[in-house]
Amino acid sequence: MPLQHFINQEKSGGIVLGISIVIALVLANSPWSDSYFHFFEHKLGFVFNGDNYLYYSLHHWINDGLMSMFFFVVGLELKREFIGGELADVRNTILPIGAAVFGMIVPALIYFSLNAGGDTASGWGIPMATDIAFSLAILYVLGSRVPLSIKVFLTTLAIVDDLGAVLVIALFYTSEISFASIAVGVVFLLAMFIANKLGVKNVIFYGVLGIGGVWIAFLMSGIHATIAAVLAAFMIPADARISEPVYLARASKLINQFREAKPNDVSTLEHEQVEIIDRMMSDSRDAIPPLQRLEHSMHPLVSFVIMPIFALANAGISFEGISFDAVMANNVALGVMLGLLIGKPVGIVLSTVLLTRLKIAKASDSMTMRRLVGVGFLASIGFTMSMFISTLAFVDETFLIQAKLGIFAASILGGVLGYILLRLSLIHISAPTR
């Protein structure tokens, strides 16, 4: 099923992402640490008539460029889920949506209560995020004994969490806005929307408008370019060039023609058969909506290339000269750690109990309290999105390092605690629960 395929891809990506984080930490604390940090500060851009355009550091290009592809896939997933997935029927998703919302609010409140009024207050958005790749990777390690309802709950929660993180970035981590550039970006978005309504299915067309128009305009506007990627993703057509009944009729006809075109038993195909296969391949491609075609083709790139590169560029922390007193000089690390490790589980558990007690939503029979708390701890793994938001929240390198330390501590502890609780709760289950 689509959800199971999504989970399988995410858990594999989580493993690769974990390896990349370890490599980044090793490099940052090795004899090559200076080379490691300086490498990502190299400037890249375009020069025209002696002037530099889009001239940013490699680190900036990774966070605003490559990560836009990650957010584009997030946008595709969100649109698919709203149309026909876990978020299509709100009645079936009240529980994980409520858990996601409370799981974002409580961590933010915990952080803000410890950092209100100071220079570090802007980091309140850091502990709000869940890393879907890592959380699902741990569910994968637990094996097939994990009830599907728990996988659906955590996946839906993480999807809503992603949407919340995107909104937080757009509304609270954007400054120095150029409304002229935004207007240009909106014009290109409108062009993509109109093309969608007119039935244009060519993904190259949308790619040119999305990158050459929307993304560059938003990059120059002051709004984080990753938001442009999400908006552009929502403009991608979700209906196929040919409908399912038409595809089935054509495929059946072509299969019959294929059978009739071979007069003997030789291993090679007749020329007519090759042409029939070409037509079937073309029809099969046209039967897949552009949205799903892009999502399917980009997922491996994002999971196994873009996310590991992001981790290599952002996860490296040098522990040289870092003391406990220095880390605790302010409440950044503590706020992030407590927000993720305490706020996430508390928000998720309290909202679930509240919604079920009020009979607003119904929890699955397989969702025991121990498993719910375990899922809450898995949701406290914030690696990717939390690190990304931390780079937007803090310019001061000291605050940034402290935030990353809090993220690492909470994510590791949350992952271990979540694994142990779920493992103990599943100890008597020997076969998959569907």
Model-based region annotation:
Residues 27-39, 53-56, 73-88, 107-125:
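Transmembrane alpha-helix boundary signature
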Residues 50-51, 55, 60-84, 303-322, ...:
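Hydrophobic transmembrane alpha-helices of secondary-active transporters
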Residues 250, 262-358:
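Transmembrane helical segments that form the transport core of multi-pass membrane transport proteins
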Residues 2-4, 75-88, 136-147, 190-201, ...:
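C-terminal ends of transmembrane helices
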Residues 139-246, 252:
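Functional cores that coordinate and move charged inorganic groups
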Residues 17-28, 72-76, 106-108, 188-193, ...:
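Hydrophobic core segments of alpha-helical transmembrane domains in multi-pass membrane transport
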